[in-house]
């Protein structure tokens, strides 16, 4: 495949040279031009090198989205180092188990200072004026750095210890290019950084901005308020519903929304279209640096077709993908562990189908279970439950059963006031008997603290500890 990147320098340097006075970053205080952004990144990188940061090292970057966190990521990359953006809500016990395997050299903590408990040197974030530029000659040139490991993004997978997927700059730019070949995002447009940089979807926003040389907004204001001043955003359906309902009498600047994370009701996309907002849905993953397939949301369950530069195939029902945006591997104990591939095709472990001229994602292969001789795909049941207007998300967990082998249990989060008994009645006739959950539970807040995607394994562990199930097992002799 031909190289897509036209940059001879880092993207922010390129735009500082070609469009120095154009607005690059919208903040709570004042906008930054590309020239101002470049100067701030350069000063920060200088002070990082003065503290010992070198080419090839790794910096863990912990915190919520902020201007300082964004600049720290760019400055780290400018130094030729790898950046590991870290969710500040990950528990200390998990970090103690995970971080020693990721060969951390320095840490930056914009949250509560938890990283100070570990042994990593803390990088001070300083932007004092730099008078000499000779130090820049010691940094790796972009032509070299763009193919080297740049980011370690923890997989938001549903089970087990997160893996650190490694991407270089070219992979991120390839991913951005694929999305921007489909979505209209011009240099005068502004995309809200509405998703965290520790998640691949947040990185996707960042690299689309850098590739296009457009505007990025980082706001500390409430989401609904922040959305009223931008043209593009990445949201889940519940957030878009709230925006449309709370701004019925206002004119919105929002033009394009990339939706994910849940079933997308036709009523929502119709209402958005009436307000002048185009909605997009798709399919992506950490290992592919975000989006693989995308389409204009049309109320159908499919995810569309592969974006430019992406390939997708079905092998015995499994979705396999291939692209230049593919991760270099997983970083573990100082080594690059290979992805699970066949001739370059990444095995996603997702079940898929090609129906009515588009691809459909049916569910995870490892989620399938047998109940009374019937194959049960949890995502099929979850899709039905999620169609209820009060449901934000749901999980179907298999539990052992003496008669059926396994039975489904539903764990539900509501976006509006609703009772589990209401859902139980509403589901009657909408599911096959073997699909109907044997038990229903509300999703505990403690299970929602690890990022955008709730861990299915953690939900299962929690379910198995519930007194109702323990008593049921004792009565059945399991």
Question: Which role does the model predict for each range below?
Answer:
Residues 305-306, 315-344, 374-376:
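Conserved ATP/PPi-binding loop(s) of AMP-dependent carboxylate-activating enzymes
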Residues 232-235, 243-300, 311:
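Gly/Ser/Thr-rich phosphate-binding loop
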Residues 33-35, 142, 150-177:
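Conserved AMP-binding A3 loop
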Residues 5, 20, 133-154, 160-161, ...:
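Conserved pre-ATP/AMP-binding loop-to-beta segment of ANL
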Residues 46-90, 375:
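Conserved AMP-binding/adenylate-forming
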Residues 369, 395-401, 409-413, 423-478:
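Conserved C-terminal "lid"/linker of ANL adenylate-forming enzymes
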Residues 173-190, 197-232, 237-238, 242, ...:
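Conserved AMP-binding/adenylation subdomain of ANL enzymes
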Residues 323, 351-435:
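AMP-binding/adenylate-forming catalytic core of the ANL superfamily
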